Amino acid sequence: MKNVLILGAGGQIARHVINQLADKQTIKQTLFARQPAKIHKPYPTNKMQTTSGKKVIQDR
C-alpha cells in the first residue's frame, strides 16, 4: 500500500487529486489542511485520515 500526503487538501486542485485517487484501494490518503472543514465531501472510499496545521504545530 502506498501512502500519499495531500497538502492543501481544502483547495480546488486537491479536490481533483483526492477524487482521482479515491477508487484506488492500494493508496492510503492523508489530507492536510489548515481548515479541515473546507475538505470537500463525500470523502474517499479508500483509507484516509485528515489532519490540520494547528494540530501539527500544537503537537511539537
Swiss-Prot record:
This is Protein YmjC. It comes from Escherichia coli (strain K12). Residues 40-60 are annotated as: Disordered. InterPro entries: NAD(P)-bd_dom_sf. Missing about 170 C-terminal residues compared to orthologs.
